[in-house]
Swiss-Prot record:
Cofactor: NAD(+)
Regulation of its activity: Neu5Ac is produced in the presence of NAD(+) or NADH, but not in the presence of FAD.
Gene3D superfamilies membership: Dihydrodipicolinate Reductase, domain 2, NAD(P)-binding Rossmann-like Domain
Species this protein is from: Mediterraneibacter gnavus (strain ATCC 29149 / DSM 114966 / JCM 6515 / VPI C7-9) (Ruminococcus gnavus)
Keyword Ligase: no
Protein name: 2,7-anhydro-N-acetylneuraminate hydratase
Knockout mutant characteristics: Deletion of the nan cluster abolishes the ability to grow on sialylated substrates. The fitness of the nan mutant is significantly impaired, with a reduced ability to colonize the mucus layer in monocolonized mice.
Reaction(s) the record says it catalyses: N-acetyl-2,7-anhydro-alpha-neuraminate + H2O = N-acetyl-alpha-neuraminate
Keyword Nucleotide-binding tagged: no
C-alpha cells in the first residue's frame, strides 16, 4: 500500500486530534502542520515538520492531502490554495460562513480535479446510518416531520472565544450545523422555504460574545413535509436529539440520554447511537456531568475529545484515507465528496439567516438561484 502524506492546517482541539487519528491509519503519514499558535507543539507530538506559509506547504512533493481545521472564518483560503496546488482537501464544518464562499471552494476543487470532503461527522454516527436505513426500507413509512434540538445553558467564561463571535463562527446555526445537515440527510435534501426567529436573550454585555443564544428554525419541504430545529445556550433544561416522525412510526436519536429508539405499532426497539454501549454511556455521563451542558460544550486546544467523539472522528479519517487509497465512494456518503452536502447545509443556513434579519419566510431559490440545484 502506498503512503499518503497529509498536512494539517489548524491544530487546535479538532485539528490536533484528527492528526493523531490519521497518523494511526494504514498507509497514512502526517508530514507537516501549519498553525501559528499550536503548530510547534503538535508537530513535535506527531513527529512532522512545521510550515508557516500555505504556498510553501502545498508545494511540498510529500503533501497529497490537507486537513483544514482552522477557525470557521478561515477555511476559504487554505481550501482554495490547496485545490490550486492539486492537493486533496478535507475541510471541517461549517465549510464556510456564506453560500458564495462555499460554492467557490467546491467549484475550485472540482475544476482542479481534487477530492473535497466535508467534515459533517454525524453522517458517521451508527445511529444516524441505521435511522437512514430504516427510512429507506420504509419501516416508518413516509417521513412527515423532523425535530432536532441542541441546547443547554452556558455560564460566563473567563475569556470570549472566537466561537462566540458571530462574524468568526457563524454562531450556533453555523458552528453547530451538524443537526441541520443531519435533518437534510434524513429528509433527502434541502427544504423549499425556511423561517428563523431568535435572538440573544440571556448573554448580553461585554462579558459575552454577540451570537444569538436562542434560535428556532421552521423548514418546509416538498410534498407537505416539515422540520423544526432549535439551538442555543439559554436553556436550563438541556436537550440534544433528532426525532423523525413517519406515517407508520417514529425514530428518536437521543444524544443527551444517549441511545436510539424505533417505535412502530406500539413496540419499541432500541439501538446504539455510537459504536458500542460503552461509547453511548460515555456520552451520557459527559452530558450530565459537565459544568457546561454537553450539547453546547466547546473544546479547547490542549484538550482531547471524549471517547465517543474520538470514535466517530476515527471513522471519518479512516473513510477519507480509504478514498485516497482508491476505495470506491459509498452512495450514502457521496454527497460529502461531491460538494452537495456542503453547499446544501450552507445554503439553508444562509436562508435562515436572511429570514432572521429580514423577518420573513425565505425560499432556498433566493440563495442558490431560481431553477438551480445543489
Amino acid at each position: 500500500m502506498k503512503t499518503v502524506g497529509y498536512a494539517i492546517v489548524g491544530t487546535g482541539y479538532f485539528g490536533a486530534e484528527l492528526g493523531r487519528i490519521m497518523k494511526e491509519q494504514e498507509g497514512a503519514r502526517i508530514v507537516a502542520v501549519l498553525d501559528p499558535e499550536n503548530g510547534q507543539t503538535i508537530a513535535e507530538e506527531l513527529d512532522c515538520d512545521v510550515e508557516t506559509d500555505l504556498d510553501t506547504l502545498y508545494s511540498r512533493e510529500d503533501v497529497e492531502a490537507v486537513i483544514v481545521a482552522t477557525p470557521n472564518y478561515l477555511h476559504k483560503e487554505p481550501v482554495i490554495k490547496a485545490a490550486e496546488h492539486g492537493v486533496n482537501v478535507f475541510c471541517e464544518k461549517p465549510i464556510a460562513l456564506s453560500y458564495q464562499d462555499c460554492d467557490e471552494m467546491v467549484r475550485t476543487c472540482q475544476e482542479h480535479g481534487v477530492i473535497f470532503m466535508a467534515g459533517h461527522v454525524m453522517n458517521f454516527f451508527h445511529g444516524v446510518r441505521y435511522a437512514k436505513k430504516l427510512i429507506n426500507d420504509g419501516v416508518i413509512g413516509k417521513v412527515l416531520y423532523c425535530h432536532s434540538a441542541r441546547n443547554g445553558w452556558e455560564e460566563q467564561q473567563p475569556t470570549i472565544s472566537w466561537k462566540k463571535i458571530r462574524e468568526k463562527s457563524g454562531g450556533h446555526l453555523y458552528h453547530h450545523i451538524h443537526e441541520l445537515d443531519c435533518v437534510q440527510f434524513l429528509m433527502g435534501g434541502m427544504p423549499e422555504e425556511v423561517t428563523m426567529t431568535g435572538g440573544n436573550v440571556a448573554h448580553q454585555g461585554e462579558a459575552f460574545g454577540d451570537e444569538d443564544d436562542m434560535l428556532f428554525v421552521n423548514m418546509q419541504f416538498s410534498d407537505n413535509r416539515y422540520a423544526v430545529l432549535e439551538w442555543g445556550s439559554a436553556f436550563h433544561w438541556p436537550e440534544h436529539y433528532v426525532l423523525i416522525q413517519g406515517t407508520k412510526g417514529a425514530i428518536k436519536i437521543d444524544m443527551c440520554d444517549c441511545g436510539g429508539t424505533l417505535k412502530v405499532d406500539g413496540r419499541e426497539e432500541h439501538f446504539l447511537v455510537h459504536e458500542s454501549q460503552e461509547e453511548d454511556d460515555d456520552r451520557t455521563r459527559i452530558y450530565h456531568g459537565t459544568e457546561m451542558d454537553g450539547a453546547i460544550m466547546y473544546g479547547k486546544p490542549g484538550k482531547k475529545p471524549p471517547m465517543w467523539l474520538h470514535s466517530i472522528m476515527k471513522n471519518e479519517m479512516k473513510y477519507l484515507n480509504g478514498i485516497l487509497h482508491g476505495k470506491e465512494v459509498d452512495d450514502e456518503f457521496r454527497p460529502l465528496l461531491t460538494g452537495e452536502a456542503a453547499r446544501a447545509a450552507i445554503a439553508t443556513a444562509d436562508a435562515c439567516t436572511k429570514s432572521r434579519f429580514e423577518d420573513r419566510k425565505v425560499k432556498l431559490s433566493e440563495i442558490i438561484g431560481e431553477g438551480s440545484t445543489i
